[in-house]
Amino acid sequence: MPVVRLYYEDLEEMVGASRELIIERLPMMGADIGKSPEADYIDVEFFPDRPDLYSAEGVARALQGFLGIRPGLPEYQVHTGSVEMRVDESVKSVRPIIGCAVVRGLRFTDPFIESLMSLQEDLHWGLGRNRRKVAIGVHDISRVRPPFRYIAEDPDKRRFVPLDFDESMSMREILERHPKGVAYRHILDGFERFPLIVDADDNVLSFPPVINGELTRVREDTTDLFIDVTGTDPVVYRALNIVVTALAERGGRIEGVRMISPDKEWISPDLSPARWTVTTSEANSLIGFNLSAEELAECLRRMRFGARHLDNDSVEVLVPAYRADIMHTWDIIEDAAKSYGYENLKAEMPRTLTIGRPHPMEELKDEVRDLMVGLGYLEVMPFTLTNEKVHFEMMRRSAGECTRVMHPISELHTIIRTAVLPGLMEILSLNQHHALPQRLFAVGDVVIDGRTKCHLSAVSIHSGAGFAEISSLVSAIMRELRISAEVVESSDGAFIPGRGADLMLNGARIGCFGEIHPEVISAFGLEHPVVGMELELSL
């Protein structure tokens, strides 16, 4: 989980409260504090679901409300600016989503610079899936000339000096020689053109999601910033809102950027709050309190929501634009509970006494995990939600019946998986920068014909991966689990014909294994042979 370093003097100045009070109240907001009596700072750990608390500015803002110093909705004005960002059609197939902002009038201190850099990297991890979904660029705007352009170009066409280097390089050279290029080049695998942000004089600001240009490096005397956030998911806009509002907490003046794409124009950022309605009956039932509508509204104002009671049972809630975690009324109610204080909940003895024991399926899962670790495999946890392209098309499998998400918030998560193997292939594709061999396994739920089942899946990738290896693995698993299944040739498109097998038990297919088809390997951007298996455990 992200660890935020908070310097006492800096935090006291931003919050307007004493060090002792801050340390006392922080844990009640859900923070885990690690401190040294002799240090001039504390390290605070928050759950990953609150990316707005990944910075000293965000923590100070939340504390001001929690302590009653500045309750209610923070107001951030987006002033009219003169900067334009022109989004070229060429980026649509590479990294199509971008949001921008200008923040002026900043005065950097060492704690401020450290906080901004930490926030940027933590958002890359927490919201950005290590820059795949979101990458953030922060630039000294005084060194470039708008309007800016967001384009995709041949990686050998243009040269510029990347951050922390003193020589000009092409994008391809950066991916081969720059430490950041080596670390993130896998994100651009398979693309013929790479994204760039350039100014009116063709100076390069950024090569997202890899590296900024040295030209726009933020220095101690920098006062005006240009922020770009690019990615493949609308969470880009949430990340932008978190960054610009954190800068505004340091006294920055936010200016909008006119975004011009081939099909629309808009002003970025959009900091308008979302509007929700919460009922006291639902809140009191959920958390065991007995709050009136006005008391509930007051609790929410201390959590930096805008809140007013509409009637005896309803509260209108304005959710600030930097709160990327609010997806349900229960998220708002949880904040009300924190504000009221869990310590104010009265303890009640349970009316019944029961003695728990592990579910047989959980015991089987633990047995399987121990077995796979003993066989030299590393456990991973692919997402249960996936999409048709990864699950069927890239696996060379026909799209069968599956459970679909009714209102997906991302095109990456539209169905519930019916198999675990595609998720393992996806994880292999994300880990090509690690050494081979890689042997991974996962134990998890799938949904088939409306029923939840548990599957084991495993993959192995290296230059010598072959049928004998995966066949030996399956034999060991079957022997240890005392399963007697018939092995027959498989017609599964995920495997090479003649090198794939199905496991049959009482006439039903309970698993499969074999050498992954080269087309599947290529679809996931892999370059070495892969073998895989899948077995139903809920027999």
Swiss-Prot record:
Supply the EC number(s). 6.1.1.20
Q: Which Gene3D superfamilies match?
A: 3.30.56.10, Bira Bifunctional Protein, Domain 2, Phenylalanyl-trna Synthetase, Chain B, domain 3
Q: Single Gene Ontology BP term?
A: phenylalanyl-tRNA aminoacylation
* Enzyme class, spelled out: ligase
Q: Which Pfam families match?
A: B5, tRNA_synthFbeta
Q: What is the lineage of its organism?
A: Archaea, Methanobacteriati, Methanobacteriota, Stenosarchaea group, Methanomicrobia
Task: List UniProt keywords, sorted A-Z.
Answer: Aminoacyl-tRNA synthetase, ATP-binding, Cytoplasm, Ligase, Magnesium, Metal-binding, Nucleotide-binding, Protein biosynthesis
What is the official name of this protein in its record? Phenylalanine--tRNA ligase beta subunit
GO CC entries:
phenylalanine-tRNA ligase complex
Q: Which molecular function GO terms apply here? A: ATP binding; magnesium ion binding; phenylalanine-tRNA ligase activity; RNA binding
- Catalysis: reaction(s): tRNA(Phe) + L-phenylalanine + ATP = L-phenylalanyl-tRNA(Phe) + AMP + diphosphate + H(+)
Q: How does it assemble?
A: Tetramer of two alpha and two beta subunits.
Subcellular locations according to the entry? Cytoplasm
Q: Which family does it belong to?
A: Belongs to the phenylalanyl-tRNA synthetase beta subunit family. Type 2 subfamily.
Q: Which cofactor does it need?
A: Mg(2+)
Keyword Protein biosynthesis listed:
yes
Start and end residues of each B5 domain: 271-347
Q: From what superkingdom does this record's organism come? A: Archaea
**Entry annotated with the keyword Transmembrane:** no
Q: Which residues bind Mg(2+)?
A: D325, D331, E334, D335
The organism encoding this protein is Methanothrix thermoacetophila (strain DSM 6194 / JCM 14653 / NBRC 101360 / PT) (Methanosaeta thermophila)
InterPro entries noted in UniProt: aa-tRNA-synth_II/BPL/LPL (IPR045864), B3/B4_tRNA-bd (IPR005146), DNA-bd_dom_put_sf (IPR009061), Phe-tRNA-ligase_IIc_bsu (IPR045060), Phe-tRNA-synth_IIc_bsu_arc_euk (IPR004531), Phe-tRNA_synthase-like_B3/B4 (IPR020825), Phe_tRNA_ligase_beta2_arc (IPR022918), PheRS_beta_core (IPR041616)
